[in-house]
Amino acid sequence: FLSLIPSLVSGAVSLVKK
């Protein structure tokens, strides 16, 4: 599960920067 966190964080960051 921990390996999925980076992808989730990067996705959230991309939405915030959007």
Swiss-Prot record:
One shorter peptide due to unspecific cleavage of this peptide has also been identified. It is found in: Secreted. GO terms for cellular component: extracellular region. One of its GO terms (biological process) is innate immune response. Expressed by the skin glands. The keyword Nucleotide-binding does not apply. It comes from the Eukaryota. Its main location: secreted. Keywords: Amphibian defense peptide, Antimicrobial, Immunity, Innate immunity, Secreted. Belongs to the frog skin active peptide (FSAP) family. Phylloseptin subfamily. Antimicrobial peptide with low activity against Leishmania species (L.amazonensis and L.infantum). Shows low cytotoxicity against mammalian cells in models of peritoneal macrophages. This is Phylloseptin-N2.
